[in-house]
């Protein structure tokens, strides 16, 4: 099976922005791959002038929120690092050897969310009047507002990137089964070892076939 891969534009975020940004992106992806009778729910972001749509499925919301909390906990232990989250859609296939039934996941689409988590700037230690690094509150507030505006624009670009990918890449999407509301998916976050995360992704690609890339 061919596995399509989409690398989303990297976003620079502060730790307090992670939750909203990831909810927006993950729910948007799942919504655009949803099937059957869903109950769309508009969500207005609190930090940005952006509205996105959820499927309205409690199980989906719970699954996404749990992974976001795990990712935030990982970020707290690994500051100043660029991070990647992978949302993978898959089909479940049953293999039936003579003694037992083996369940295999065939990945047909993977989304990579790339974040650069910024650490809040701290004023320099000391009272030297020669220091030019001290920023007055007004200037700091203006810089934060400017950065927030840029992040909002970048987040909108990511949402457009998702919609473009979904509209252009359809041939690899599996047939719809009766009664299915959304395709099975999993969310992978970095582990305590970056190499383990990379090896896990490599194994999935091997099981799914050679992926096609769209930046």
Curated annotation (Swiss-Prot):
UniProtKB keywords: Autophagy, Cytoplasmic vesicle, Protein transport, Transport
Record localization: Cytoplasmic vesicle, Autophagosome
Superkingdom, natural source: Eukaryota
GO cellular component: autophagosome; cytoplasmic vesicle
GO biological process, one term: autophagy
Family per record: Belongs to the ATG101 family.
Name listed for the protein in its UniProt record: Autophagy-related protein 101
Protein's organism: Arabidopsis thaliana
Lineage: Eukaryota, Viridiplantae, Streptophyta, Embryophyta, Tracheophyta
Gene name, Swiss-Prot/TrEMBL: ATG101
């Amino acid at each position: 099976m061919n596995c399509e891969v989409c690398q989303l534009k990297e976003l620079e975020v502060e730790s307090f922005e992670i939750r909203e940004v990831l909810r927006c992106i993950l729910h948007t992806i799942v919504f655009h791959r949803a099937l059957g009778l869903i109950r769309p729910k508009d969500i207005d972001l609190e930090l940005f002038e952006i509205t996105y749509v959820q499927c309205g499925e409690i199980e989906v919301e719970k699954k996404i929120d749990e992974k976001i909390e795990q990712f935030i906990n990982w970020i707290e232990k690994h500051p100043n690092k660029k991070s990647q989250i992978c949302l993978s859609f898959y089909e479940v296939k049953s293999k039936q050897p003579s003694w037992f039934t083996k369940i295999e996941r065939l990945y047909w689409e993977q989304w990579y969310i790339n974040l650069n988590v910024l650490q809040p700037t701290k004023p320099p230690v000391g009272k030297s009047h020669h220091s030019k690094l001290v920023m007055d509150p007004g200037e700091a507030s203006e810089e934060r507002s400017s950065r927030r505006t840029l992040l909002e624009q970048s987040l909108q670009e990511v949402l457009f990137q998702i919609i473009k990918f979904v509209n252009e890449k359809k041939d690899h999407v599996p047939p719809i089964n009766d009664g299915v509301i959304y395709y099975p998916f999993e969310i992978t976050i970095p582990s305590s070892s970056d190499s383990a995360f990379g090896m896990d992704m490599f194994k999935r690609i091997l099981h799914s076939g050679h992926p096609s890339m769209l930046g």
